[in-house]
Amino acid sequence: MASMAAAIAASRSAVMSGNRPLDDRERKRFTYFSSLSPMARKIMQDKEKIREKYGPEWARLPPAQQDEIIDRCLVGPRAPAPRDPGDSEELTRFPGLRGPTGQKVVRFGDEDLTWQDEHSAPFSWETKSQMEFSISALSIQEPSNGTAASEPRPLSKASQGSQALKSSQGSRSSSLDALGPTRKEEEASFWKINAERSRGEGPEAEFQSLTPSQIKSMEKGEKVLPPCYRQEPAPKDREAKVERPSTLRQEQRPLPNVSTERERPQPVQAFSSALHEAAPSQLEGKLPSPDVRQDDGEDTLFSEPKFAQVSSSNVVLKTGFDFLDNW
């Protein structure tokens, strides 16, 4: 600010020392424009120098001539003069200037939409490349696709799902120029299956959460049933699992009370004497090893939860992840 004030004061003193003193309005104007920016201050100083150069004749010149003199002195003779817009040299360098701008009629496809100039098109959320993109223009009809489309075969839903998954993987690996009408139909069936899977609710839905292993088997062509259609274990296996914990429960019954033991002391004594008379080898052969007992104990511990899991397979659904279902 100090340098600006000093420059303004210096220019004002230089102007005041000229032939004609500035009036109050010109002084305010000079102060205002000089305080805008350093470039504006430099321009005002140059104008005052031009005015001092002409002296008292400057006041007698018309305003248009004053502006012309200022422009000529500020720009300088070495600056190139503006060219005529119809100059032949400019037209050769910029051929777009030859035709009239803003009068080109643009038509939008087959629809009845026209507008002038490519810059005055109606607003659209899609770009021009997105609007002009089409798969049918890039597709090449293959003979195998034509035969497959002409001979439709009834397929099960599982095989349709496997074909849809195969077609989706094939479309990722193959290029766009191999697409055909059958590929579009397969992709449509794939999205239809996905929609049915996401819409299915309850244990009676056709497509329920498939695990990754089931998806892989569908890709291989194997038929995979959802959890609601899985066969339950045979009744014999279930009866065997039921009998095993029942026998264990019978073994774990409480001992008879003291009154019955007092009434029948003879069989207990006979059984204990028979045990003492038996050979240790026979006892080792009859009694199971501690490892076998431990295994039997573990089987008894885990047998009932397994039965509960089998019985509730229709109610509790799979999570959809192998590491959660099979750990």
Swiss-Prot record:
Q: Where in the cell is it found?
A: Cytoplasm
Q: Where is the composition biased (Low complexity)?
A: 1-17, 162-176
What is one cellular component GO term in this UniProt entry? cytosol
Q: Name one Pfam family in it.
A: DUF4706
Where is region (Disordered) located?
1-22, 76-113, 134-299
- Extent of Basic and acidic residues compositional bias: 182-202, 233-252
The yes or no answer to whether the keyword Ubl conjugation is present is no
Cite the InterPro entries for this sequence: DUF4706
According to the UniProt entry, which residue ranges have a biased composition of type Polar residues? 134-148
- The reply on keyword Phosphoprotein is yes
Q: Which domain of life is it from?
A: Eukaryota
Residues with the modification N-acetylalanine, per the entry, are: A2
Q: Which UniProt keywords apply?
A: Acetylation, Cytoplasm, Phosphoprotein
PANTHER family assigned to the protein according to its UniProt record, in alphabetical order:
SIMILAR TO RIKEN CDNA 2310022B05
User: What is this protein's name?
Assistant: Uncharacterized protein C1orf198
In the UniProt record, the gene name given for this protein reads C1orf198
